[in-house]
Swiss-Prot record:
<keyword id="KW-0418">Kinase</keyword>
<dbReference type="Pfam" id="PF01121">
    <property type="entry name" value="CoaE"/>
</dbReference>
<feature type="binding site">
    <location>
        <begin position="11"/>
        <end position="16"/>
    </location>
    <ligand>
        <name>ATP</name>
    </ligand>
</feature>
<feature type="domain" description="DPCK">
    <location>
        <begin position="3"/>
        <end position="197"/>
    </location>
</feature>
<keyword id="KW-0963">Cytoplasm</keyword>
<dbReference type="InterPro" id="IPR027417">
    <property type="entry name" value="P-loop_NTPase"/>
</dbReference>
<comment type="pathway">
    <text>Cofactor biosynthesis; coenzyme A biosynthesis; CoA from (R)-pantothenate: step 5/5.</text>
</comment>
<protein>
    <recommendedName>
        <fullName>Dephospho-CoA kinase</fullName>
        <ecNumber>2.7.1.24</ecNumber>
    </recommendedName>
</protein>
<comment type="function">
    <text>Catalyzes the phosphorylation of the 3'-hydroxyl group of dephosphocoenzyme A to form coenzyme A.</text>
</comment>
<keyword id="KW-0173">Coenzyme A biosynthesis</keyword>
<dbReference type="GO" id="GO:0005737">
    <property type="term" value="C:cytoplasm"/>
</dbReference>
<dbReference type="GO" id="GO:0004140">
    <property type="term" value="F:dephospho-CoA kinase activity"/>
</dbReference>
<comment type="similarity">
    <text>Belongs to the CoaE family.</text>
</comment>
<keyword id="KW-0067">ATP-binding</keyword>
<keyword id="KW-0547">Nucleotide-binding</keyword>
<dbReference type="InterPro" id="IPR001977">
    <property type="entry name" value="Depp_CoAkinase"/>
</dbReference>
<dbReference type="GO" id="GO:0005524">
    <property type="term" value="F:ATP binding"/>
</dbReference>
Amino acid sequence: MIILGLTGSIAMGKSTVSRLFAQMKRPVFDADKVVHQLQAPNGRLLSAIGQAFPGVIDEKGVNRQKLGAQLLQKPEGFRRLEAIIHPAVVEELHLFLRKNRSHPLVIVDIPLLFEAGFTRSVDYIAVVSAPYWIQKRRAVSRPNMTESRFRGLLARQWPDRKKRQQADFIIENGRNIIALAAQVRQITGCLVGQGSR
């Protein structure tokens, strides 16, 4: 089994690439989705997050807007939050890998792959990248996203240039879905049949 780590900065189109891999019947571990499940009503991290960040839990689980507001006021809270979330994500990742070990290629979609130290868990890394003007346009068109919030999120991530330097594959996402799908097929063809490093 080859484990391909998929990452990219905010609004680069990583979710679209992840869906393309899934459409090719490749198992995809979606770290964002896992985190949402862990923070949903009855999610196993609710208690720990509620203790660390009072007032952020409601009937829908973790209220991400309230949590985000607390983190903007006290950025050191990011480390505390990551210390709660990352071990649970690692556990879920190990379960996913065990469940899918018979597949020749699995995709591990983790936005903070480099920043959170998940590179040791994958065999290869694909970085989704786009020109800055496209990235910014996509980001600020999202609900509840402002330019200052976008800049703050970018500041917490490795620069795109640095991610590209560490990548085994760079997926350029500045054109159209047809070009994007062709790159996904090319990477899949390159990796399937090779085995892990």
